[in-house]
Swiss-Prot record:
The gene is pyrB. One of its GO terms (molecular function) is amino acid binding. Keywords: Pyrimidine biosynthesis, Transferase. It comes from Geotalea daltonii (strain DSM 22248 / JCM 15807 / FRC-32). This is Aspartate carbamoyltransferase catalytic subunit. Carbamoyl phosphate binds at R58, T59, R108, H136, Q139, G265, P266.
Length: 311
């Protein structure tokens, strides 16, 4: 099937079939990353602009590597080195970038909805690399790919997501994607970090106790506390947070024996999870990073008009 969207703003906008297409393509493209020469001519002659208004290590680097492995030209623009520091608006930045005729803009922005605003004003494709606390679709896709590689399916899995749900765009993309693919999502976190009505996003159960969420889970996804998005301190101390919502070996034993431990990064060791869990045999955190390149290759491929041959 052909991917019918010009942009990828969020997993909320995609059907189950479209998510499946992006994941299947990522699995096929992943083989390129293990070749001696890690490059194919798929996007030769295309230009990808990485426009990042927020700090990023994994996502920006991963998108740049993904574009280059598809033979696209890449341009990296960060807020600190652009005219944004001189007061230029997003609209003016977009118009100036568009005048250079890029084919795809990959953007991260602190304001939720910024990508909808941009996509309506440019003719090229727009990929959301994270907008405020709204969505982070590439992270949601790579999380699902990592789970599917481990279990061979997403349907019926119990996925526990623990931490700062209110301020996490990763949590929202994971919820949209996982529930659409038939997984059962259980959330746990401090009451001050659990948004009201979150259950309406899909097949979601909110647990007051982390242990309830983790019990018999196939996947335990730990989230970072988003201090930079909090207007005020929502926790007495980090030590208290770790006591009630940190993942250690004792809590992990409540999950299934083959349960996966995941984290979108960056990790705060000793807060969200202990080092022995982060570095243990059940940790798939580095596998998530590895899968990120293939997933972002898939996203770039499909918004540029790529289509897999049908049987």
């Amino acid at each position: 099937m052909a991917f019918k969207h010009k942009d990828i703003i969020g997993l909320q906008d995609l059907t189950r079939e479209e998510i499946e297409l992006l994941l299947s393509t990522a699995e096929n493209l992943k083989e390129i990353n293990s070749r001696e020469i890690k490059k194919v001519p798929t996007l030769r002659g295309k230009t990808v602009v990485n426009l990042f208004y927020e700090a990023s290590t994994r996502t920006r680097t991963s998108f740049e590597i993904a574009a280059k492995r598809l033979s696209a030209d890449t341009i990296n623009i960060t807020a600190s080195t652009s005219s944004v520091t001189k007061g230029e608006t997003l609209s003016d930045t977009a118009r100036n970038v568009l005048a250079m005729n890029p084919d795809i803009i990959v953007m991260r922005h602190a304001v939720s909805g910024a990508h909808h605003y941009l996509a309506k004003r440019v003719s090229c494709s727009v990929i959301n690399a994270g907008d405020g606390a709204h969505e982070h679709p590439s992270q949601g896709l790579l999380d699902m790919l990592t789970m599917r590689q481990q279990f061979g399916k997403l349907e019926g899995l119990k996925v526990a997501i623990v931490g700062d749900i209110t301020h996490s765009r990763v949590a929202r993309s994971d919820i949209y994607g996982l529930t659409r693919m038939g997984a059962n999502v259980f959330l746990a976190g401090p009451p001050t970090m659990m948004p009201p009505g979150i259950e309406r996003l899909g097949n979601v159960t909110v647990c007051k106790d982390m242990r309830e969420a983790v019990a018999d889970a196939d996947v335990v996804m730990m989230l970072r506390i988003q201090l930079e998005r909090q207007g005020k301190t929502l926790l007495p101390t980090m030590k208290e947070y770790s006591r009630y919502f940190g993942l250690n070996q004792s809590v992990l034993k409540l999950a299934k024996k083959d349960a996966m431990v995941m984290h979108p990064g960056p990790i705060n060791r000793g807060v969200e999870l202990s080092s022995d869990v982060a570095d243990g045999s059940q940790s798939h955190i580095l596998k998530q990073v590895e899968n990120g390149v293939a997933v972002r290759m898939s996203m770039l491929y499909h918004v540029s008009g790529g289509e897999l041959p049908t049987e």
